[in-house]
Amino acid sequence: MILLIDCSKGLNLILGNRKKIIQTLNKPRIKKVSEALVAEIENLLNSASKSYKDLTKIIVINGPGSFTGVRTGVTVAKVLALSLNIPVCGI
């Protein structure tokens, strides 16, 4: 399972595999991405009946966009990848 994190403008999450998109979340006008990101990832996984252990890769958008949003997304992606021992890729 692949998780894509895009906080460059608002909050966008995509959960999928190589063949299809399983679940998405799009909140373009969210104010505090740093406070909502982890909770929204958990909500996305729960709505797809998945857990963190199902993730095999994380992809994160590393710009251009909101400096704070991009920094938050990259930090959360790196922490998740490190704790789950899975690869992370910035694009």
Question: What feature does the model see in each segment?
Answer:
Residues 57-62, 67-88:
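DPxDG-like acidic metal-binding loop motif
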